[in-house]
């Protein structure tokens, strides 16, 4: 991948670079994904998650920008793995962009084949929100991480992480949410990363409190704050596959253990034991096969240490990066003895159609987001947990790129909120349209047996019809852009998932599209979990009037 040193920043204000606000939204969100405040390696088009890109290469990026600038409001741009391949006449209620990223026929759905295609310039890895142009920086995963640690606290620590120590690793675009999520729940956390730049970035954006290169200092500070029952987050420079076994050797057992290193990609995401970043980069280039093998061996040691800590009483869970699968394939037969975070903590929310709903102010004016915060606090005042989240986010979350907000809303709530936002744009309360979207990690848009659909009640973990149906219904209902990806979060061969974005531009047509899309999208989550036999999903469907032909 050619590196290009240029600063990309989404336009602000109400002046259009395109022929309509939906096209403008797509353009601004693509550019926002590559804003240096947002992207991990913008010079390589990498947004987050190892090699999760916004476009296949710089030529494709420019072609997408040019296409969006000339796209009519009754046309649809097709993007294949980060390359614009066609513009067809459609209609005004159709999506302006349809994206398919990283999708491979199952027999060939592995990293080796993907890399062959990538080398030939035929494919890119879109992760989840990188290639679908709706990444908002670390805030995008923050509430989900906060909810996960909050539920762990409710289940195991009397509702708070006060006086507890969490040990984790990985402070990239996704994992970087962990330190703040733990301290928001009152706990102490040591978060390990091998890349000083990642730790520095989290400290700069106030997601992490302090930096150290010393395990001794990290433990001393952690114990001091744990005793005081005060929260602190400590970014520790080092390799988790070395530090965790060392802690096991010393008989030091944290209260909570997880991991968000980029283990989903053994070549580009994980650094083997004994290598600096520079040495790893050289080996990756010179001998990728040896690199991958060393990486897998290190991951196995990492998981062995997590299992040892679990045996000693630590609440241990996988945070969706497929590290257990790698260790299992390397011969560690009890790698799956600790659960994934979705079955352990999140699935009840999915049954209610809840998930990581987000919105972005295209104006670039933070006041537009603060006004929408007030809407949440007013309209959902009976949901104390949600309102607490909004208040904390306002105080503690620094915007990256265009101002944005995330909160978990369920079936019915999303459509209600979308209607209000569109009205606020229409009457001028908000200074420009709002983009409404979500992560692909949602209640009804993913098939990922080692993450979102792990341990489904009926054994349907690997059934991949659901994300396809999700993308289809969102497209026909008028989402502004819709994406279908493969391999996000857990790597090639392990997931299929769909994303959607809808623009609230204040028009009556947008109001109708918002009503349809923000009903069917979370509705798919309720339907998927009803089909799998979850009582809470059945209750939700009956209470909310979701029409499911064979529901009992």
UniProtKB/Swiss-Prot annotation:
Q: What name has this protein been given in UniProt?
A: Urocanate hydratase
Required co-factor(s) are: NAD(+)
Q: Does the keyword Lyase apply?
A: yes
Task performed by this protein = Catalyzes the conversion of urocanate to 4-imidazolone-5-propionate.
- Organism this protein belongs to: Bacillus cereus (strain B4264)
Per UniProt, NAD(+) binds at 49-50, 127, 173-175, 193, 239-240, 260-264, 270-271, 319, 489
Q: Which keywords does this Swiss-Prot/TrEMBL entry list? A: Cytoplasm, Histidine metabolism, Lyase, NAD
How many cofactor units bind, and how? Binds 1 NAD(+) per subunit.
Q: Which InterPro entries does the annotation name? A: Urocanase (IPR055351), Urocanase-like (IPR023637), Urocanase_C (IPR035401), Urocanase_central_sf (IPR038364), Urocanase_CS (IPR023636), Urocanase_N (IPR035400), Urocanase_Rossmann-like (IPR035085), Urocanase_sf (IPR036190)
Per UniProt, subcellular location reads as: Cytoplasm
Active site annotation, chain numbering? 407
GO terms, molecular function: urocanate hydratase activity
Q: Which family does it belong to?
A: Belongs to the urocanase family.
Q: What is its EC number?
A: 4.2.1.49
Q: Which reaction does it catalyse?
A: 4-imidazolone-5-propanoate = trans-urocanate + H2O
Q: Which EC class, in a word?
A: lyase
Biological or metabolic pathway of the protein: Amino-acid degradation; L-histidine degradation into L-glutamate; N-formimidoyl-L-glutamate from L-histidine: step 2/3
Its GO CC terms are: cytoplasm
GO annotation terms (biological process): L-histidine catabolic process to glutamate and formamide; L-histidine catabolic process to glutamate and formate
